[in-house]
Amino acid sequence: MAELSEPEGPVDWKERCVALESQLMKFRVQASKIRELLAEKMQQLERQVIDAERQAEKAFQQVQVMEDKLKAANIQTSESETRLYNKCQDLESLIQEKDDVIQNLELQLEEQKQIRIQEAKIIEEKAAKIKEWVTVKLNELELENQNLRLINQNQTEEIRTMQSKLQEVQGKKSSTVSTLKLSEGQRLSSLTFGCFLSRARSPPQVVKSEEMSKISSKEPEFTEGKDMEEMEIPEKSVDNQVLENNRGQRTLHQTPCGSEQNRKTRTSFATDGGISQNSGAPVSDWSSDEEDGSKGRSKSRCTSTLSSHTSEEGVQCSRMGSEMYLTASDDSSSIFEEETFGIKRPEHKKLYSWQQEAQWKALNSPLGKGNSELSKKEQDSSSDELNKKFQSQRLDYSSSSSEANTPSPILTPALMPKHPNSLSGKGTQLVPSSHLPPPKLRIPNVFSISVALAKRHLSQPQLSSDRMFGTNRNAISMIRPLRPQETDLDLVDGDSTEVLENMDTSCDDGLFSYDSLDSPNSDDQEHCDSAKKVAYSKPPTPPLHRFPSWESRIYAVAKSGIRMSEAFNMESVNKNSAATLSYTTSGLYTSLIYKNMTTPVYTTLKGKATQISSSPFLDDSSGSEEEDSSRSSSRTSESDSRSRSGPGSPRAMKRGVSLSSVASESDYAIPPDAYSTDTEYSQPEQKLPKTCSSSSDNGKNEPLEKSGYLLKMSGKVKSWKRRWFVLKGGELLYYKSPSDVIRKPQGHIELSASCSILRGDNKQTVQLTTEKHTYYLTADSPNILEEWIKVLQNVLRVQAANPLSLQPEGKPTMKGLLTKVKHGYSKRVWCTLIGKTLYYFRSQEDKFPLGQIKLWEAKVEEVDRSCDSDEDYEASGRSLLSTHYTIVIHPKDQGPTYLLIGSKHEKDTWLYHLTVAAGSNNVNVGSEFEQLVCKLLNIDGEPSSQIWRHPTLCHSKEGIISPLTTLPSEALQTEAIKLFKTCQLFINAAVDSPAIDYHISLAQSALQICLTHPELQNEICCQLIKQTRRRQPQNQPGPLQGWQLLALCVGLFLPHHPFLWLLRLHLKRNADSRTEFGKYAIYCQRCVERTQQNGDREARPSRMEILSTLLRNPYHHSLPFSIPVHFMNGIYQVVGFDASTTVEEFLNTLNQDTGMRKPAQSGFALFTDDPSGRDLEHCLQGNIKICDIISKWEQASKEQQPGKCEGTRTVRLTYKNRLYFSVQARGETDREKLLLMYQTNDQIINGLFPLNKDLALEMAALLSQVEIGDFERPFSTPAGHVTNQCKVNQTLKQVIEKFYPKRYRDGCSEEQLRQLCQRLSTRWMALRGHSAADCVRIYLTVARKWPFFGAKLFLAKPITPSSLGSTFLWLAVHEDGLSLLEYNSMRLIVSYVYKSLMTFGGYQDDFMVVINNTHSKDKPTEKLLFAMAKPKILEITLLIASYINNFHQQKAAFHHLSAPALLSAQTRGPQARMMGSQPLLSSSRPTKGPTLL
């Protein structure tokens, strides 16, 4: 300043400015130094403060300890001190002695270890010798086996020559003599199938007929059981009546005890078409679909049936004592074997004698059509008259050997379809051909408990056999429970006594008119009659009641009301028909819900619906290569085979041991679940050609050749065809039958390195993909399929030891394309590190590993490029960079394996993860953070270790310059640094409720990157552990938001070892319920456990999830999130869940809150709306996570409607019925009935339920009474009359709009609406004072009158050319099958049982159903195509598959139940209801007889 004030001389401002700038720079340098010194000093002071605080805390603790000691200690004398000193000396000496003992024990342990090692070596030497001996012995057996095969072939040729000669001799004889002689040969065939009844048990001893009659006379208690066994009904057609008469005479002549034996054979109802099923179909009857019509074949069928019948009787009698409690058939095939025959389900409460009369008329009609129509006079006939008729026909029953399968009355509800009209029109679709084998169904012999036993052991009055059903339904009701007590509307106008009988005794009297049918003699009948009188005299006669007038009126309307009114406006419905065929859905959302399925294709195998493709079939998707030339050759071979296999051909017997070859001559295969598929009946080893791999071939060379029957999906008609496959020379050829192998094959499949084998759903099918085609194959049993897979994999040079070990389970730690070098050979493979094992595959898409390397305790290190294998690899000229890196893996007791890696980043990542997987303590690999974690792991996370204070493990305000973990590429390293910046922004910015979207966006973007790049999941977990390891002052919010972000992160995924170990330790050290930080640590611990239990998530957190975590203190709740679930009656239930809750767990919580049964019993499912806003719903699978559903729905909604506010629309969850089972209706809860009523009302409103206008009003009145209550009449006072009248009118209009069908109210004038409201009010007032439960019961009783109640209807248009026309129709999916209904009237066109559905699903842009027409010879399969919207195709496909698989699960559940277990289950009624099962006997069910407890 002094220089500036001097006036002398001019001032050089430029120099002055430069000088000042230099001074400024000096000041800045000094200031920066001062800042650095201050920063260092501050850090030093902070450390000192921390140390001081820690020391002060320790000192404070010591002071407290000393104070406690001073307070507790008394003044000790010198004697007490001496005593304590002596005690201390004694303890020290005792410790020394213990140490000596421990050392001695350790020495002994070491000696024992050495001894065990020596013994192990000796055992290994012995095992090697034994193995060598076994190998030599097997080779000798193999040579001997080959010699035996040659001998067998020679003898087979001789047998064929003899049979041809025998056939010529037989042709010269008369038809009667030939029939008698053929019976012996066919008996052998039928005996083979007769033994199916006893498979999975010891072979039964066949009992002679005389011995059987003795047994039955000595053991009278079995007679009642036999009454409930199966009976025979003859199959009578135009062309074989005479033969059946002859057969009947021979049966009477050959079986003296025929009347008793015939009670033991199985029965089934004759269908409308009059086609009975042949329970004893011979082998030759199955072998060709074209061979029926010759008289010789009819004769052979008759004789074979007779012998099969007698053989099965002996088997059943010999095992009666051991099998009297069986409740299901022995075979494990589908439940549809009992429902194949399209049997007509009896309507509820009708006496069983009417059904018996229908059977009797069907048997005596020349064409067997007496069961199609029943007159009222026939229906009203008494049970006594019918019993006399049946007794007069007992001779026909005992003399018939070609029987139809008729279920016994106790199984009638189980075996009959629900829909009585399903056989009209083209109802013959339900009737399979008699060529199919019958179901092996045995009636549970629960009625063999004698009266004396019941009296002695159960302390009950003596019972007659016709009362046993009402009192001992234990095993029977478990097979198929009876439907609930509902009123049969057809009997409303009858006498009140008849109504009472039908309501109260439908299970007792009606069904047991059967019992008098088979009474052995008059004495037994008199005994039954006397027993009846005793039973009837025990309980008091219940009072007779008529229906109330209001209920009778509703039932009277319902009798004729289940139909459409003639006049209503269909224009509004027709307008929407074409529009509904064109919706699409959001791919992002549906890819999560349906697991990337678009329109899948299913096939029916072993009674189960098995998915064979997740996308629709195209024209060439199934790879049919049956060219025209091969077809012509197949026709030639077929005609030759027909000429060779005449009536007396032993062709079937030659292959009769193998069920897989029974239908080899047929072009279309019998479905695999139509016969037994035990491996013991598969192709015998001696019969296989030389190319077939023998099961006893345990040599070192793996088999590369095989032949046998497989089922192949055809090309144009998607049906299964049985073909004889021959694998030889790396090529898979297929023929029509084994005899055609000398001709040109029908097709061939070239197996090359580009082929892939993918197992289908539930390991039922195999998808073989080549360069040109995709083939779908299946076998008769899983074991045969596994053998084929193994041989095919050997051909494809897949060295997997066990073909069942597909893609290893678990989350891969690392994966990538590497070059593996071993023993000088190099190969480019896809490597995946899972756990402590390195798997390598041929390609990334391959599911079968080529091999694996166990890494535990292996030596993993980086090596220089000095090994010979590397140099050889470079010399070979492969396409690998010359600058590659090498990692060597040296497992214990194995040679080294070299991995060649192209980049340094990738090499570092692989080296670190391989080292960790090997369990190495090497801390010189990986990043600095990883090395520190490894050191902590070596010291087991010692809390006092200085490693915890390392800056790399602690919170830092500055960004990181390199990732905390090793990453395989530079791009991922850059992303990791950006990820840390995003976490810093989330942590440092204060949470503001109005601007919460900023934090939501940051969290979603960061976690989405980690889901897209799984390599970054370890990185973000390590970053959040680092940023939450230091406690900030309470006024800084940073660390708390770090804990919140960590909670969101661990709810999605978990890091790998050892970072998972570090995370658990970090959470454990910070868990403290007294602080907010500690509460979040406890919440994170819960999230870690749940994520480890249910697996990783698929979608980023939703807005709702992030809001709940940031603002609503999630640590206070075990289920921190909640969402409303809507019901069909307009109410909702809020249900809680966490980040890992699956749909199955969510539904368990919902059912507990609402008092409903499990979805498997109730048929209810959870649905979501479509994000696009269209009227679509998506059914949720049980393993999807609720949070993923909400998140994907939000993302799809934003994409499809970007302009709307994201926070306003959320996913809507609806809980409603998806699968309806009439057998489960008995255990419906009140809530289920209510929701079912409202769901039915929704169908009525939308025109998916047929009812006329009168019945619609009655139903609307019932719903109004349930929802609103009693109808409020207008007040009579002038003051309030106007206001109240307006209120009443408004209520009536709302009811009409809510409960009355749209099609009936659209277009109505004001006057018509007023009259409609007046009629509704009249019906509503009639319900005054009645409870909601009564109204719900009546509503469902009326609704169940429609045969398709509970079915889901889909609008479809048949694709021309089709026999169904080209107009719109309804596809009704219900528990018994698929039905086609007329569009306007909803009358049945045709029904198909699920058994006849071969393939169903997407075909191009349409819905495809392939039907097995077993009754048609000209067209054994039929493919139906329907134009539908793609979402509806997916929905109907999954719905059909669910029905089929649910029946299969029910069959499996009931299969192993026994009567003693069921008897014990009855005593546990309340417990069974708690577990969701149904009680076997309802305590409220009225009965006339005493009940067995």
UniProtKB/Swiss-Prot annotation:
- Gene Ontology process terms (BP): negative regulation of actin filament depolymerization
Q: Which residues form the FERM domain?
A: 1121-1451
- Subunit record text: Self-associates. Interacts with TGFB1I1.
PANTHER family noted in UniProt: PLECKSTRIN HOMOLOGY DOMAIN-CONTAINING FAMILY H MEMBER 2 (PTHR22903:SF3), PLEKHH PROTEIN (PTHR22903)
* Extent of Basic and acidic residues compositional bias: 208-230, 374-388
Membrane disposition: Peripheral membrane protein
- Which classification does the entry list for the species? Eukaryota, Metazoa, Chordata, Craniata, Vertebrata
UniProt-annotated location(s): Cytoplasm; Cytoplasm, Cytoskeleton; Cell membrane; Cell projection, Lamellipodium
Q: Which ranges form a coiled coil?
A: 20-175
Q: Which UniProt keywords apply?
A: Cell membrane, Cell projection, Coiled coil, Cytoplasm, Cytoskeleton, Membrane, Repeat
Task: Identify the Pfam families for this entry.
Answer: FERM_M (PF00373), MyTH4 (PF00784), PH (PF00169), RA_2 (PF21989)
Question: What CDD domains does the database record attribute to this sequence?
Answer: FERM_B-lobe, FERM_C-lobe_PLEKHH1_PLEKHH2, FERM_F1_PLEKHH2, PH1_PLEKHH1_PLEKHH2
An example molecular function term from Gene Ontology annotations: actin binding
Annotated ranges, domain PH: 703-797, 811-919
Record function comment: In the kidney glomerulus may play a role in linking podocyte foot processes to the glomerular basement membrane. May be involved in stabilization of F-actin by attenuating its depolymerization. Can recruit TGFB1I1 from focal adhesions to podocyte lamellipodia.
Q: Which SUPFAM superfamilies match?
A: PH domain-like, Second domain of FERM
UniProt xrefs under SMART domains: B41, MyTH4, PH
What residues does the MyTH4 domain cover? 955-1110
Q: Which GO terms describe its cellular component?
A: cortical actin cytoskeleton; cytoplasm; cytosol; lamellipodium; nuclear body; nucleoplasm; plasma membrane
The name this protein goes by in its record: Pleckstrin homology domain-containing family H member 2
Tissues showing expression:
Kidney. Reduced expression in patients with focal segmental glomerulosclerosis.
Residue ranges, annotated region (Disordered): 202-230, 245-335, 363-439, 613-705, 1474-1493
Spell out the disulfide connections: none
Annotated organism of origin:
Homo sapiens
Q: Where is the composition biased (Polar residues)?
A: 245-260, 267-281, 389-409, 421-432, 676-698
